[in-house]
């Protein structure tokens, strides 16, 4: 039956993806623009990178632009990155450019994944693995599990490097 084939396809391929990412070069906590760009450049350099974002849709606050006007403004210093990600943009005033926030966020995610990064959405990092006086991984659980206060054991993911890309929250630092 097609229904069970669909379910088996989702379960088996997701399990394989998760298993492939239990031991990483780099774990990035947070799926905002800085974390996504870091994932892109690190994966492009050949490192095994996974990004963990607590939201259903990674991208941080970029989706909404400013006050849900889905336009964003960037400074001249970031224009080379915008061009590398092939994001449409137009000059606004001296040193400022405007772009569509939805296109921009989508482009960042698309390029990070195509460079080889794996993005896990709806994952919260609830702790870090600390061995030999160094952070050596993250402890993850599904965001809805934590939000509901369920007592469900997390999973451990090893990483040579852990990056806090949680933006304004600095969630990882407060663990």
Question: Language-model features: where?
Answer:
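A conserved beta-strand/loop element that lines the FAD pocket in flavoprotein oxidoreductases
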Residues: 115-125
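N-terminal Rossmann-like FAD-binding beta1-loop-alpha1 element of flavoenzymes
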Residues: 24-47
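N-terminal glycine-rich dinucleotide-binding loop that anchors FAD/FMN and/or NAD(P) in oxidoreductases
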Residues: 65-88
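Short hydrophobic core segments
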Residues: 157-167
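Extreme N-terminal leader/targeting segments of oxidoreductases
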Residues: 1-25
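Conserved beta-strand-loop-beta-strand element in the redox core of flavoprotein oxidoreductases
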Residues: 129-155
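Glycine-rich FAD pyrophosphate-binding loop
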Residues: 44-62
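Conserved small/polar residues in nucleotide/adenosyl-binding loops
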Residues: 173-175
